[in-house]
Amino acid sequence: MENFFNQFFESIGEDKNREGLKETPKRVQELWKFLYKGYKEDPRVALKSAYFQGVCDEMIVAQNIEFYSTCEHHLLPFLGNISVGYIPKEKIVGISAIAKLIEIYSRRLQIQERLTIQIAETFDEIIEPRGVIVVCEAKHLCMSMQGVQKQNAIIKTSVLRGLFKKDSKTRAEFMQLLKS
């Protein structure tokens, strides 16, 4: 890692021995371990260990779960909120497990579209609800800092499975809950 940063500093015309940069390779290495720890965790385990047989058969919504991730195209952050709604069949999941699922997938090099799909597919596979919906809203620093340089653009993605995909009233109920 140190050689990588020494070459990087040299390529941009920076002095690798400058006081403020001497410890940067070590600091960044520790930061990257934290930012990308999602590769060392199994998102399925996070859900499998946190569900129980439920008595609820109505919609459950976890709204505005904050996340940050790193765009795999430019290695710049994107951050925002994810909301997950589901209609249980037999299993109900602890709300913190939904946040953990989001954290595991977002702590990887990502694109927003895949992040949204992975959350929905894993939830659907492990919890087996009658329906699941995932809505992700994010600001991409790669869009703000370079290229088109649009500071206030918000990108929204969604994935629908089961009743949310088949029934427009169910979708509308979820969207109304997000607004209230």
UniProtKB/Swiss-Prot annotation:
Keywords: GTP-binding, Hydrolase, Metal-binding, Nucleotide-binding, One-carbon metabolism, Zinc. NCBIfam families: folE (TIGR00063), PRK09347.1-2 (NF006825), PRK09347.1-3 (NF006826). Zn(2+) binds at residues 71, 74, 142. It is an enzyme of class 3 (hydrolase). It comes from the Bacteria. Its EC number is 3.5.4.16. InterPro entries: GTP-CH-I_C/QueF, GTP-CH-I_N, GTP_CycHdrlase_I, GTP_CycHdrlase_I_CS, GTP_CycHdrlase_I_dom. The gene is folE. It comes from Helicobacter pylori (strain ATCC 700392 / 26695). One of its GO terms (biological process) is tetrahydrofolate biosynthetic process. Pfam families: GTP_cyclohydroI (PF01227). This is GTP cyclohydrolase 1. The keyword Flavoprotein does not apply. It catalyses: GTP + H2O = 7,8-dihydroneopterin 3'-triphosphate + formate + H(+). Pathway: Cofactor biosynthesis; 7,8-dihydroneopterin triphosphate biosynthesis; 7,8-dihydroneopterin triphosphate from GTP: step 1/1. SUPFAM superfamilies: Tetrahydrobiopterin biosynthesis enzymes-like. Toroid-shaped homodecamer, composed of two pentamers of five dimers. GO terms for molecular function: GTP binding; GTP cyclohydrolase I activity; zinc ion binding. One of its GO terms (cellular component) is cytoplasm. Belongs to the GTP cyclohydrolase I family.
